[in-house]
Each structure stands twice: as structure tokens, then as C-alpha cells.
């Protein structure tokens, strides 16, 4: 059931009389990051005819193995299968990573305190008195004051009398004696609604604002109020304004209207400025004419909350009012019909892994009435690609680098233009006639058909390669051939391109409705001692962020959803997060950024991640779904982005479900031993909690249409309930860890806890050794985090949660032991902590499966986001408010099926079984 891998390596067969050295050079250049893909570039006696003739291969001979190559008949893979047994001791990197994680946790808690102390990051704009205004011309109001009744009606808070509970020094709103409609500054008359420059602080560019009030304060001073415009560099984008994404740049004349206002004294006004409102969907020519004679223009609004760039809600920038909480809700029922939704949309999943993000998005979109289909997926890990293809058989899964995928898309567009959009029949007729006239030489053979396409950007011969199926040869003899070698086979190329375009094996601009993905940014990893803080994008390990945005710029999807670790907002002053925002805004996308905690959506783990929405100006900008579950708080948001945490306001008292615990997630799973060779087994018991009943549902009950109307394979079976096998020494150690809450290596013989919670050897106990002769308590456990750690060989408990699901299962420096069994958590137990349905099967060695699960986006988070995406796509929500309160029934979708299945279970739905 493995997917067809366009970039899979296969040793080429030497053809004709000699094999070019070119193929060998390709091998040498591809060993570092991916499987070597050899391409036959053999010299030919003569050009092949249009039928695809090629010099016949010489008789197959045994060849020495080339590093990184796959022998014929072997399973295709990007790296060798390793023994699925835990390492005897943690390596230096593993221990260092653990120490980095501990430091990060401590720093995160400090940031929470700092964020609370700092309050809102919004900057109050206080104007400075203009030098010109301090001359002979004293600023003054013009005309009679606005009538008292009108003034009190338009600006009621200005006339509220301060009370003991609302002292003037605590009230940000200046009080007014009267209001005016115009004023004169430096002999220039200004009226309400005028756009002006306002003198800013030292070394700051002058502020830009729209006058909304003129009033005389109770202190007899003359004031004006401005609703501020922001330049791109004034927003959270800040210094990241010089980016260039596929030709898209920030226009220095473009500004963004905000809802922020400040009061300043009248003589801070410098001059008028002509600013026009431009409809973001206006014809480019009409837009050029409109802004030709203005100083500045705006087509979007900006809000510090969720770093939002959005369409102006109504004409001329008169933004519609929002609710006080900035939250919208929909009490309508969800789409729970077993019939597929009528409206469809296409999805491209970049850096897809095993498909957690796209799976969740599709499940959530289906609940809103939108059938979101994952049509394409790209990932470099071949095992993850196998998992995704198995669970989404209709998806075109490509096992290749994202930058080579982008290069292929551009070449594919050229091929489609040549062979699909143009009339090429007349040009190919002569080739077909010539092919009939040619006779087949004894050293030539025929191309039967082309069955795959990829782009090779690493070898000396860069460009498009086709996978060729040779006439009279089996699949094991298929080879990858550069397009130049098939230049005399236009009929075969046309046939492949036309059929491929019909099936949409690759997307063209306009084909993709949604792009999602989490570009890896390993250059900001805490363990990376050589991180480039000044220019993070010059680090090759961060370049995938650029590639992701380049793909967005090329395909121009309606929607973009990027996921990443919170470190992109912390490292180098949030450089990578700001870069991503800057790219979308420069490409004229609406955008907003939020941080979401997985536990808030029904999982027993914390796991905070960043999610960045992008939407074309013609579409509704999606909201963020508010939490539905309580959660144990761990860490916090970076100061500059503290208003991006997706959460209820402190003044609100939402009705949240009780936080889920480990017992809720997997207390129903059968006992397994340290070594479990079977990846398919029976449950052997009934579910005990609502979560367990839900996670066991079949595809149709979850509205997963990956197999169409079919049920899909393996449903009803327990999959991947296998732990990483502990080595003999660790297994002996784990068997001696007590079965109790909080147990760890400190409970082993010979360990004593001294001052400051630091472990030390108990001088009264002789050191205990294992049957292998190694110590029961390893030295690394005693010295980890300077002897203060509780993590080595730590046992989880039923009433706890985990900080995050990790990609490795070694117990040396993390708490990952099962509550009551002598083993680490299984792949399925980890998958449940990530919200993967039980029917979701994984492929590859056991360690690879842990990696796939740990790297995935938590499915319930993606599901909630998918629902908001569907609401926006279908036009059933507006983009003015950043947050959305999910319907009360959202967390119990599938309840009909759940309750039906629960009929034979003693525990009522929603009741958690105590362990």
C-alpha cells in the first residue's frame, strides 16, 4: 500500500555501449540529505524515434553497491531501518536537549510573569509639540462649540463625571468642557476627518492619523484625537519590511488603518496628508489611477490583537463595531449527516509528515459543511509519506524536498502550456510518421509509457526527470530519465502531461484553495549552538520558511495556514514569525497570528504552537476557535506577541469542560509487554470514557471521506499499540521503578535526596549492579540537570497530563513510563495524546512512528481550525473578529455514534473512570 514515490531511488540500468559518468556524479552529490536517484544518461547510437525507442540495455551484470542506492527488489526508503530497541545510554545530544528543555520551561514561566507585569504591548502614541506651532501662530479652535446635546451624544465618556471609584488619574479618558468641528494650526485649517502628520518622539518618523475629535479639556488645554494609521514598519512586522517574495514587496506608500486612538495637544499637528482608501479587490489599472495623486493609501486595517491585517469592514475605513469581547459565536447545529458535503475545496499539505494537520482540517471543515480534500501532500520522510498515503489513498503524495517540488511546479506549468493548452497535434504528426518508418535496431528498446515525474535539483544535470516504463521489461527495470533523453518522444510526453493534467497530479496556480504546513526551522533549535541571531534566514536550516512562502506566492491559494513552534516568536526578537507575517501582507493577503494550546481542545497535553492564517482579500479571514476544555497552564507567550494567545479574556467566565487526563485517553488499552511485535491486535475490552469512545469511531462517523463511501481498512482493530523495546539494562531498571505516582530513578536503591533537592549517593547503601554488570542507577541520571531532575525513568500517572508528545521514547531523561506497566508509552498511546483516530495507521520502523506522531499537529486543534476555515470559506462568518466560540455541540460531534456504542458499556458518556 506504499505510495508511488516520485523521488525514490532506483539504480539505473546501463544502456547502449557505455554509461556516462554523469550518473555517478549525481550519486555523489545526493548522499547527504536524501536517497540517491540515478538517471541514465547513456550515450545513444542515434536519437530515439517518436515511439520512445532507446538503445537496448546490455545484459544485467552484478555491480558494486553505491552508497545510498537501493538494490532492485528492496523496499524504497530514505534511510536504513534501525533496530527498534532503546539505546543503552543517552548520547550527548539527547542529554543536552533535555537540559535545554528544562531551561526553556523555566524561562517560559519567567516570561509569563514578565508579560503580566508589562501588560498590553500596545504603544500609546504621544505627540510632541511642533517647533513651528510654538511660534507666532497660537493653535486655536474655529467657530462655535458643538451643541451640548450633540457633544454628549457623540462623545458621552468625555462628559462623565469622575467618581471616587473612577479617579481622574485612573481614567485614561480625558474629560471635555466642549467640542469643536475645526481648528487652526500654523494658519492651516483642520476639520474632523482630515488625515494629518503628527509630531512623533525623537528619532521616530512622524505619526499618521485621522482626526476624530477637537475638544477643550477640563484643564482648559486644547486637544485633538487621532485614529492612527500604521506603516508596515510601525506594526509587528517592524524591521522585516524589506522582504521580496517572488517579486512581492511592501509599498512604502501603503499604510494600515487601526482602531487605536490617542489624545494629544493641538500643536502636535504638523500638516495635512492625502490618504485614499483602496478596495483591495480593485482592478490594478484603476488602483494605479486612484493612488497616482495621493500621498498614501490604505486597503487593510491593522490590530495589535492577534497581529491582524484584515479588510476594512466597510467603505472609506469606517469600521463596523465589534462586540466588546471581540468574540463571535454560532449556536447553529453542526453538519453531522453521514452524507458528504456538497461544497468542496482542495488542500495542499506541505511538510505534511504523516498528515495530522490536513486530517484535522478536513474533519473540522466537514463539520461546517465544506468537503475539504487533501489533493496533494509533500514531505521528505518516506515513512511519513507511506502513512499519509495509506490513510488518504486519493492524495497525490510526493516524497521530495519542498524546493524541488516548487521547481517541478514551474516546469509542469511549462509542459502543460505546451502539451495541453496549445494545439500540438500538427507539430507531433511528423514525429509519429517518422516513428512508423523507423526500424528498431537490435541495440534499441521502446518506451512503453511514462509513469512519474520529478525534479532533480542536486545533481549536475538539474531539471525534470520522467519515470519510464520500458516495453518488455518489468517494474523493477523502470528508470528515471532526464527530459532531454526523451526529446524525441513527444507523443509519450504529451500523453503523460495530458493525462496528468486531467488527474491534476500536480497543481497549477488557481488549483489550490488551501495550503497548510509547518516548515521546519531547525536553525532556532535550543540545541543548535551556532544559531544565527542576526540573520536567521541565512541559516540553511531555516530556509524552508522561505520556500513555504515562495510556494504560496506561486500557487496563490485562497487560504494559508502555517503552523510552527513558539520559538519562531522568541528567537531573534521573533524574526521568523515576523518574516512570515511580512510575506503574507506583502503578497496582499489578510493575515492574523495566534498561539493555541492543544490541551484546550480536548487532549491531556499542553503543547503550545503558533498558527498563522492568511486569506486573499476576496475571502473572509478565518477566526481562531476559543478553548473548549480547561488545561493545566505551562509556559506563556513572548511579550511582543502576548496579545496573540487564543484564550478568553480574564473578565469572562466561560463554561469549559474538565481538563482531560492520561486516564481519559488510554486507560482502556490492553496490557502489552516491553516487546510487542504485532502492529494489529484486538482491543480486548470496551471504552471507558467519552474520549475513548470518540477516538474509536470509524471514518464515516468522524466525517472522514478519505475512502469515499467505503469504511476503509483496519477499522475496529487496535493499530500500532507497540512500545519502543527497552534494552535489557533499562528493562531491569524500569521493573524496579515503583508503581506509584511520581516514581522515578530516585526511588531506586542507593539514591539519596540531599539539600536543595539535589540527588547524591547514599553512603550507607552499597551500589547495586545489574545482571550485565552495569550500575542500577546510571551516572547520567544522577548528574542530569545538576542532580535536580525528576525525569530519568519517570513514571506517568493516570491523573496527570504531559507537557508535549515527543518524537523519541527513551526514558533516560524524560517521564514516559506507563503508569502501571514496565515499559514506555506505546505509539498508539502517544497517537491518542495527539488526537489521532484509532483507525489512523502508521508505517515504518517503530522509532520512525514515534517521530511521525511527535512531529504532527494535534488533530483536535487542526479540527477546530478546520471548522473556522469552513465557516469563512462558505461565507458564514465575517473576518472582523479574531475569536470564535465553537457551538456547544462541537466537542460531542459523533455523539449519536458514541452513544450507540456506549449502550453496552457500564460507564455513562462523559464520566471519567478513576484509576
Curated annotation (Swiss-Prot):
GO CC aspect terms: nucleus
Family annotation (CDD domains): BAH_plantDCM_I, CD_CMT3_like
Domain SAM-dependent MTase C5-type as annotated: residue spans: 345-876
Top-level taxon: Eukaryota
Ranges of biased composition (kind: Basic residues): 42-57
Domain BAH, first and last residues per copy: 188-313
Function: May be involved in the CpXpG methylation and in gene silencing.
Protein name: DNA (cytosine-5)-methyltransferase 2
Biological source species: Zea mays (Maize)
Chain's gene name: ZMET5
Amino acid at each position: 500500500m506504499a505510495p508511488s514515490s516520485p523521488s525514490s531511488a532506483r539504480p539505473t540500468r546501463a544502456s547502449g555501449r557505455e554509461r556516462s559518468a554523469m550518473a555517478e556524479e549525481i550519486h555523489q552529490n545526493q548522499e547527504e540529505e536524501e536517497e540517491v536517484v540515478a538517471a541514465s544518461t547513456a550515450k545513444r547510437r542515434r536519437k530515439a524515434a517518436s515511439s520512445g525507442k532507446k538503445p537496448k540495455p546490455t545484459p544485467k551484470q552484478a555491480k558494486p553497491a553505491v552508497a545510498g542506492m537501493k538494490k532492485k527488489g528492496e523496499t524504497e526508503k530514505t534511510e536504513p531501518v534501525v533496530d527498534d530497541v532503546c539505546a543503552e545510554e543517552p548520547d550527548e545530544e539527547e542529554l543536552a536537549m533535555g537540559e535545554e528543555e528544562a531551561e526553556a520551561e523555566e524561562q517560559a514561566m519567567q516570561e509569563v510573569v514578565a508579560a503580566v507585569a508589562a501588560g498590553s504591548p500596545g504603544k500609546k502614541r504621544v505627540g510632541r509639540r511642533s517647533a513651528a506651532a510654538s511660534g507666532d501662530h497660537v493653535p486655536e479652535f474655529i467657530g462655535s462649540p458643538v451643541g451640548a446635546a450633540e457633544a454628549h451624544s457623540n462623545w458621552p465618556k468625555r462628559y462623565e463625571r469622575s467618581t471616587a471609584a473612577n479617579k481622574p488619574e485612573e481614567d485614561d479618558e480625558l474629560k471635555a468642557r466642549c467640542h469643536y468641528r475645526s481648528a487652526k494650526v500654523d494658519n492651516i485649517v483642520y476639520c474632523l476627518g482630515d488625515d494629518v502628520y503628527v509630531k512623533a518622539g525623537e528619532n521616530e518618523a512622524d505619526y499618521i492619523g485621522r482626526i476624530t475629535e477637537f475638544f477643550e479639556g477640563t484643564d482648559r488645554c486644547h486637544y485633538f484625537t487621532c485614529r492612527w494609521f500604521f506603516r508596515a514598519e510601525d506594526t509587528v512586522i517592524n524591521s522585516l519590511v524589506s522582504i521580496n517574495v517572488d517579486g512581492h514587496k511592501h509599498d512604502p506608500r501603503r499604510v494600515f488603518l487601526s482602531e487605536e486612538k490617542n489624545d494629544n495637544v493641538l500643536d502636535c499637528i504638523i500638516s495635512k496628508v492625502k490618504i485614499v482608501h483602496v478596495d483591495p479587490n480593485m482592478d490594478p489599472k484603476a488602483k494605479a489611477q486612484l493612488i497616482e495623486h495621493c500621498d498614501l493609501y490604505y486597503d487593510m486595517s491593522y490590530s495589535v490583537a492577534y497581529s491582524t491585517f484584515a479588510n476594512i469592514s466597510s467603505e472609506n475605513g469606517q469600521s463596523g463595531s465589534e462586540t466588546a469581547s471581540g468574540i463571535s459565536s454560532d449556536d447553529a447545529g453542526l453538519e453531522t449527516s453521514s452524507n458528504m458535503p456538497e461544497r468542496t475545496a482542495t488542500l495542499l499539505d506541505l511538510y505534511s509528515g504523516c498528515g495530522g494537520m490536513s486530517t484535522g482540517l478536513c474533519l473540522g471543515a466537514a463539520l461546517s459543511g465544506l468537503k475539504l480534500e487533501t489533493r496533494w501532500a509533500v514531505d521528505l520522510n518516506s515513512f511519513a509519506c507511506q502513512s499519509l498515503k495509506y490513510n488518504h489513498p486519493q492524495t497525490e503524495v510526493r516524497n521530495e524536498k519542498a524546493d524541488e517540488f516548487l521547481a517541478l511546479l514551474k516546469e509542469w506549468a511549462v509542459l502543460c502550456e505546451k502539451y495541453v493548452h496549445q494545439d500540438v497535434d500538427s507539430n507531433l504528426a511528423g514525429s509519429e510518421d517518422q516513428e512508423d518508418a523507423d526500424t528498431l535496431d537490435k541495440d534499441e528498446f521502446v518506451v512503453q509509457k511514462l509513469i512519474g515525474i520529478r525534479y532533480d535539483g542536486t545533481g549536475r544535470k538539474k531539471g525534470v526527470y520522467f519515470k519510464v516504463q520500458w516495453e518488455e521489461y518489468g517494474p523493477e527495470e523502470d528508470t528515471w530519465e532526464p527530459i532531454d533523453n526523451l526529446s524525441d518522444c513527444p507523443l509519450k510526453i504529451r500523453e503523460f502531461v495530458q493525462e496528468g493534467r486531467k488527474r491534476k497530479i500536480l497543481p497549477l496556480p488557481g488549483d489550490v484553495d488551501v495550503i497548510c504546513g509547518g516548515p521546519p526551522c531547525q536553525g532556532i533549535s535550543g540545541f543548535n549552538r551556532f544559531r544565527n541571531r542576526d540573520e536567521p534566514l541565512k541559516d540553511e536550516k531555516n530556509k524552508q520558511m522561505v520556500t513555504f512562502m515562495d510556494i504560496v506566492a506561486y500557487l496563490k491559494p485562497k487560504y494559508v495556514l502555517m503552523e510552527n513552534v513558539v520559538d519562531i516568536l522568541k528567537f531573534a526578537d521573533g524574526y521568523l514569525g515576523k518574516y512570515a507575517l511580512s510575506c503574507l501582507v506583502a503578497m496582499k493577503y489578510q493575515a492574523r497570528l495566534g498561539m493555541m494550546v492543544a490541551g484546550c481542545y480536548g487532549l491531556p497535553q499542553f503543547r503550545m504552537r503558533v498558527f498563522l492564517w492568511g486569506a486573499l482579500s476576496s475571502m473572509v479571514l478565518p477566526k481562531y476557535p476559543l478553548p473548549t476544555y480547561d488545561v493545566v497552564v505551562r509556559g506563556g507567550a513572548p511579550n511582543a506577541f502576548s496579545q496573540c494567545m487564543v484564550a478568553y479574556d480574564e473578565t469572562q467566565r466561560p463554561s469549559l469542560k474538565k481538563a482531560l487526563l492520561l486516564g481519559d485517553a488510554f486507560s482502556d488499552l490492553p496490557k502489552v509487554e516491553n516487546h510487542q511485535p504485532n502492529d494489529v491486535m484486538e482491543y480486548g475490552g470496551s471504552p471507558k470514557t467519552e474520549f475513548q469512545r470518540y477516538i474509536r469511531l470509524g471514518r464515516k462517523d468522524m466525517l472522514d471521506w478519505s475512502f469515499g463511501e467505503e469504511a476503509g481498512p483496519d477499522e475496529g482493530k487496535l493499530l500500532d499499540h507497540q512500545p519502543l523495546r527497552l534494552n535489557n539494562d533499562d528493562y531491569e531498571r524500569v521493573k524496579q521503578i515503583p508503581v506509584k505516582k511520581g516514581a522515578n530513578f530516585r526511588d531506586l536503591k542507593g539514591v539519596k535526596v540531599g539539600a536543595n533537592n539535589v540527588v547524591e549517593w547514599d553512603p550507607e547503601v552499597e551500589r547495586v549492579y545489574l545482571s550485565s554488570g552495569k550500575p542500577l542507577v546510571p551516572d547520567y541520571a544522577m548528574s542530569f540537570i545538576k542532580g535536580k531532575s525528576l525525569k530519568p525513568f519517570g513514571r506517568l500517572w493516570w491523573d496527570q497530563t504531559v507537557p508535549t508528545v515527543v518524537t523519541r521514547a527513551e526514558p533516560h531523561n524524560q517521564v514516559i513510563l506507563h503508569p502501571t506497566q514496565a515499559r514506555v508509552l506505546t505509539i498508539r498511546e502517544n497517537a491518542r495524546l495527539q488526537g489521532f483516530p484509532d483507525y489512523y495507521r502508521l508505517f515504518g520502523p517503530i522509532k520512525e512512528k514515534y517521530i511521525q506522531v511527535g512531529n504532527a499537529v494535534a488533530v483536535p486543534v487542526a479540527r477546530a481550525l478546520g471548522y473556522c476555515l469552513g465557516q469563512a470559506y462558505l461565507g458564514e462568518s465575517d473576518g472582523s473578529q479574531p475569536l470564535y466560540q465553537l457551538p456547544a455541540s462541537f466537542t460531542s460531534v459523533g455523539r449519536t455514534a458514541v452513544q450507540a456504542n456506549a449502550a453496552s458499556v457500564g460507564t455513562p458518556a462523559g464520566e471519567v473512570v478513576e484509576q
